[in-house]
Amino acid sequence: MRGVETRIQEIRHRIFREVARMAYHTEWPVDKRIEALPYKIIPGEVGNYRNDVFLERAIVGERLRLAMGLPCRSAAEHAPLSDNIEAADKPETYYTPPLINIIKFACNGCAEKRILVTEGCQGCLAHPCVEVCPKDAIHLDRYNGRSHIDPEKCIQCGRCADVCAYNAIIIQERPCAAACGVDAIGTDVNGKADINYEKCVSCGM
């Protein structure tokens, strides 16, 4: 989220600070240093961000490699962080394409788009959401009159959200896909975000 200092920004600052230190202190053995850095950036035995300290360190490790211009790796690759580290020390190479990457094991795999009825539904008498649904995907609870959406029928057109007077129906989208102006982010076979590099303009949004 641009303009807002978040915990992601905090981690990013730490990572770039450590990479800059490695570049400045040329006497340090880079291969040993990079292996130790995830433990320095994410100390202790309990995760602070994802409740899994090992996952946090693995993600930080890949972020360190990407910050040094090395390629993004999958979780299936068994190799130390220092693998091919010498490629980062070539003055003619700034980074290994692509510029924008998704660390797959860091992705939450959230839904691309879904429409939800929140607790704000008042079970109103008019129920315009039911009336405008082109697929008859909304039914009313027989006890409290609140709306419920059948995900099997819903085509996610959003008309119900548009007509709700209480703003009780929300449209949830995958944040990265919603931010992409060229529709370059889709979903892979594992439900993780995936970049179509033929569309991607590397804007970083």
Q: Residue spans of the language-model regions?
A:
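Ferredoxin-type iron-sulfur electron-transfer modules and their immediate structural context
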Residues: 1-163, 167-179, 183-186, 191, ...
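Solenoidal tandem-repeat scaffolds enriched in leucines and small polar residues
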Residues: 196, 200-204
